[in-house]
Amino acid sequence: MSSKADSTIETMRSPYVMVDDFLPLDAAEAMRLDIDTHFGNSESHRPETHQVWNYWFVPGHYAYLRTTPQKLIRPDRVDNFMQVLRRWSAEALGLREVTWPYLSLYVSGCRQNLHNDSANGRFAFVYSLTRDRRTTSGGETLVLNEGDLFRNNVATAQSGPGFYTSIEPRFNRLVVFDDRMPHGVERVDGSMDPLEGRFVMHGHIRDKGAIVSGALTEEQVASVVLEALIDFSGEALARIRLYHGPVVFRLFIGASGSVKSCAVLLDRVTAIDANDLGWPKMLSSLVAKLTALKFPEASGETTVTQPVLMGTSLFRPGH
Amino acid sequence: MRVLYAILPGRFPTVGYDPGLWWDSVAVDARYQLSSYSINFDWWTVLIGQPFARLLLDPLSPLERQHRQAAWSANDLDVDGLAVAAAGALKRCQDPSTYRSQESYLETLAPLNAFLGLVNRVQSEFLVDVDVGPHVRNLDYSNSRSLVDYSRSSGLLSRSIDAAIVKVPATDDVVLLSITSPEDLLTALMTARKFRARRPSVHISLIDHGYENFSLSGTIETLRARRSLDSVFDTIISSKDERDETVPALLEAIAAEKAPKGFIRRRDIALPSRAPPAGGAPFPPPPTFAPESILWTRLSKRRCYWSRCTFCSQNAKFDAPQAPAHSEILASLDRITAYAEAGYGQFMLSDEALSPSSLNLFANEITRRGLRIKWACRSKMERAHTPDLFDRLAESGCFEILFGIETISERILALMDKTTEGLDAMNVAAAFRAMADAGLGMHITLIAGFPGETLQEVRQTVAFIGRTLGACENATFALNQFQLFADTPIGRMPGEFGLSEVGKPGDICGPLSYKLAPALADEDDRLHSEMPRIRDELDTMLGWFDIEAIPGGPLARHLYFYSGHGAIFKSRADNPFANPLRTAELPRPGNPKSSSSIAAAE
């Protein structure tokens, strides 16, 4: 992993991010060509190759078709996509677990009503293989704005963008958003031709412990970081319950074991009370504790990316 | 009055394109300060180097940049590292030592090839190609309104042009532009908007729009009615034939504050013609990525003397079909002499087909004058192309002739209306041998898939070219696929050639879609699906196939075949690419053969 120097790291605080041209264009086009080929030559379709779609219909909520992507796309291409996404997620978000995606198809009439995935992960990802030039409309990912949509707008006339962000499913665009955000998919209208529809690969991104690269081992790092976290928890035990969400730190540790810098890579911690202003101070305290840590001496530098979760577990038991 | 001739972002610059005779007279007219600037050279320098990543990331927020760079890293794309290497390679393209051996040329082009590939992989706005420059994806280049609309965009292409024009002073009163393709037209529109934004009073004129198969001449009235291009350019010179007289008249009108507007012809400028100043000054060699200055020019503004080929749209540019007169050739040679003195070492004569008699006269006159230049030309194979003529041409400095052989099928040649009495495949083979004996290189162009042509006929042509060129030195080729253009005999009478459902032409010239009669369609489908294999077979027969596997190989082959780099090599006695069948095994990844053994073998 080639991490940027701490001084240039920007903290991700927004509820969503977009990365256009996520894969090299030829890699994205090859996956799309597999989809096009699957739907081509309809006379030769056979049950074992083409009866692959699950029509996911939940009245009032969901209506779209989904499958596992390798049923249409060459498995090594899906593997490559997943490998790149995992690397990107580790580098950009500091979260290294990415669930195997669904490939979904939205033809005319398909949609997702507003919902959240608070129980599914930290972030959702949606990677689009939808053609930029298509004869359908809709298919945008809708992410509701943060805050109180009623109180924030009581005196202001608002329409769509005032309440939510609408993200076009551009070809080769990756969208990542906070799983706790209410979101949906705009109904697709127009042609029934599947090739004109919305194709996306989507799933969830989660934390899976620290990411350590460099001279120190994970074990050497874990025990030291734990000191800071225990110390922080001891000081802030009561208040931690007022907050919810992930914060990710990136520590640069010199060969001497001293922390050269500690940057906040991601901060999606949300106060239960919208008026709470205490989190920045708590975050500074945690940064200070991590910066003060002393790791074992080693033969070289080490980079540690450490996710920390505020609030109770987001996961269902056994998930 | 300050007048700028701006060379637009477009194909990879390895030659200078002659702006036309108007340059010579305006350059010595004391009323004007005439200069030229290659925005194209700067554009490629911006694109192939570290500025590329900066331009790509500039509009993003710091967080978005971080995430985009993380995506490059996750994809193992070392954008900055490759950019540095490619920028170095670009500079080495100007160094003569790069062209000494296959190995040094391939080594130079490898990082350039890799970076061009990367440019096309990490952004989706446009495809960059050494042949055409930037080509915006999903844009309708056949429609002037699409181009005009897109020229307002602020995407990567726009930002790259902004970066390329920063060194051009915004002090010119008049900017003159020439285009050679629909892609150039888009960059012309974008560049014009930028000049206008910097200096609203500037007069911007599109003075030339004819090159090879591309010309606006056939649709000029439609364009005039649509009011698209003239919403951006102040004036557009309608006729290429009149360009050299119209540009000086236009400048005079602008100076007199009587500037015309829109599509203009010489007669639209009411000012009386002034006699051009005595003498002239050559167009100074523009910077290119080649070690020698090569001028892409013409002997005359005449059409091809044959002017009958049913597929050919090149004639749309000019009106006069007669071969150039003796006096015209001598005048052109006077001009070429002046240009040689100004620093040009090579001349590529792009007249569609110079007749054997014109070539004979031109070569004899060069020899008589003792002029030492290197030149290449195009011709149509005739019985008059005798060994004696080839010897005379070689003696005068000619190093290559392009022949459009198209096919050896007499049936298809008849359909193309390109039959020459008494000239069959054996005569053509003999002519190739005579050229080789004279030390002349050749570039042979073929057309596969002419309506009604069979796969077997294409294979016979390819086998013939493989056999005959394999025995020659400095022989390159282009196996083109038939394209239908509106302004051609077949475009005007598609039904007579078995074509139907011909696509409606846009107002910008380009190939048209069509359907073949059922009796021809199946064979044509087979032929099209076989074309990649046939191309590979021809490459294999002539020793070019392996080069594709070498880093830098695909770009090296392409530039050798189709750019000024080929002229650099072919005009030398010790061309390392003269015949890959005879030269040492090319260096390949994993090939244990050392560089010294390759150099020794050469």
Question: What is each PLM-predicted segment?
Answer:
Chain B
Residues V3-L8, S201-H203, L330-M442, A448-E453, ...:
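Conserved SAM/AdoMet-binding glycine-rich loop
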Residues L4-D24, A30, I39-L333:
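Acidic, low-complexity intrinsically disordered segments
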Residues A6, G10, T14, W22, ...:
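C-terminal accessory regions of radical SAM enzymes
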Residues R11-V15, W43-W44, E183-L186, E212-S215, ...:
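Flexible loop/turn segments at secondary-structure boundaries
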Residues P19-W22, P51-F52, T191-A192, T219-R224, ...:
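Short secondary-structure boundary/capping segments
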Residues A30-Y32, V168, D172, V232, ...:
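A structural motif corresponding to the C-terminal end of an alpha-helix
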Residues D173, T310, G345, F399, ...:
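Short acidic/polar active-site loop segments enriched in Thr and Asp
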Residues T219-P248, R392-I401, Q460-L484:
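Structural recognition of alpha->loop->beta junctions
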